[in-house]
Amino acid sequence: MKISLITICWNSERTLSRSLKSVLEQTRRPDEYVFVDGGSTDRTLEILEEFKAKAEPSGMAVRILPQERHEDAAGIPDAWNQGISDVTGDVIGMLNSDDWYESTALESVETVLEAHPNCGAVSCPTRFVNEYGREEKVFYPKCLSVFLPFMMPLPHPGLFVKQATYDFIGKYNVGYKISADYDWVWRFYKAGLKLAYVKDPQVNMELGGLANSNREQARNETLKIASRYGAKRLARMAWLLRKITGR
């Protein structure tokens, strides 16, 4: 089984080394690692080159790509798609430049995939960490059929997807700036694909990010997406509740 990782980055020098250190410390290292850089002007590219020099002698293929720009395409899902198109692995993980793995993350994913060969993706619980390094909570994957109309039921940083699944249902919709992952999970669910699960948290996610800083747009996108897939009434209720609570 060939495992590929993708990290998209832009001026990520503050957190990137922590992410890369967690990859080098894996008990099962990735076979391939592709970076899509959005035009960094800080030390991001230097850090990536240093990582490449450390990783490649162990057999990991590392490529650093400049992000391609497409008119009217949201930058983050567009960069994800560029990485997906470039990698050659059987399973693909997306590691954000401010997130990091537990040392057993990829080994755990591989074990679950071997035990559930018919699944389309694997979901890992993700630990939310504040700016001081303290755990706020753990986001455990939720039942898609119950929670999908209301919320994103899976932590995207903990999602490892087979390349065959992307081939079957497509990559990310670049029309959504914030909630392209939510749209993708809806398509996964509608296609009737199976999801397998890792029991323990394997990913650490630093709180913040685009969705948390643009809550109104995130609410509007999730309402639009859920309505598109036939859950307008439930999605509208969830939208109103989030509007009232400011979430």
Region locations from a protein language model:
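A conserved acidic beta->alpha catalytic loop
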Residues: 37-46, 96
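Conserved donor NDP-sugar-binding/catalytic core segment of glycosyltransferases
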Residues: 104-136
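Conserved nucleotide-sugar donor-binding catalytic segment
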Residues: 140-221, 225
